[in-house]
Amino acid sequence: MESFEFVAAVIVPGLVNVHTHLELTHLVGRNDEVEFPKWLRRVRELKDATTPDDLSSAAERGLRECWAAGVTTVADTGSTGAVALGIARLGGRGIVYQEVFGPDPASCDQSLAELGHALGHLRPLASERLRIGVSPHAPYTVSAPLYRAVADLARRERLPVAVHLAESPEETELIRDGAGPFADALRARGIAVEPHHCSPVQFLVQRGVLASGVLCIHCVQVDDADIRSLREAGAVVAHCPLSNRAHRHGTAPLAAFRAAGVPVGLGTDSVVSVGSIDLWAEAAAAGLTGGDALRQLTLDNARVLGWETEIGSLDVGKWADLAVFAQPVPARPGPTPPALLTVIAGRVVHRPEAVSPRAR
């Protein structure tokens, strides 16, 4: 076993990132679209033009960037399986939600078959460190029948679920009014669009998607009734304040979530949105500093993912997931300190060249 000695350093539990898209790490700085629907379309084009080898490299680079920042656990959504393979190969920890798409009700069976095929490749990778889940992507990319089918699959197989939800005004316009740029794009593909006269949250409630532990990503465009529905379902929220700011979507009502008893975690979203994987910056954007930020990024984020009994604090009986920093936890917003050492399940996954094991 390696031994390290640090002077004037602090040891903290490994940080937990509740929302990433690490297979997109190579796309940082490559999408300058301003309007959200166009930005999404450009991401898809860039991703489709990427080779499988480059996606694998991007996923592994993203994991290593997380570890360099002291992040030991990620909750990642993606469609290629590259992040799951990276975690399994490199020895990381995380939940990987396999995305499924299909806005046309007529393609529901095909989308479900593709999801089943992908899960067939991912299930053998599952371990104590890697959980496999599903992610029906978003209300503008998933039909009502597909939402129901994926929710049923997740219940049968006890799979974790993540959904992008109530992120943008355009999403609300699509679901409530059957109008706006998302509606226009769907109709241009020959897909019928009807108004549902409800919010995106209520749309998923009505289709049985929201349940205990379902990770609802963003939840910016919500009202009091939506918050009550999230609480009653036992759902949890992944808040990505810098991404919401970058896309001008507004701010999630954190105080209202907390007052209602809806658990909230912090994530970074993709580097295509925010340029870096910086959980401390996300905490600062959410108004958290010092010990409050540290608790949120460790135990509270672990609790959102249902992993609080195994990680999130330096307690006897939990996994040895930890990070060492050369300076105290930031008391105010500022540059994120790099980790001097990052350990997952007792194994060193990040160590700068200047840090060497102590001679024995």
Predicted regions and their residues:
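His/Asp/Glu-enriched, well-ordered alpha-helical/loop segment
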Residues: 206-210, 239, 250-327
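Histidine-centered catalytic micro-motifs
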Residues: 13-25, 160-170
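Alpha-helical scaffold segments that flank or form the walls of functional sites
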Residues: 10-11, 28-91, 113-127
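Active-site beta-loop-alpha junctions enriched in small/polar residues
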Residues: 21, 79-80, 99-103, 135-139, ...
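Histidine-rich, glycine-flanked metal-binding segment
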Residues: 1-12
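C-terminal cap of metal-dependent C-N hydrolases
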Residues: 303, 319-360
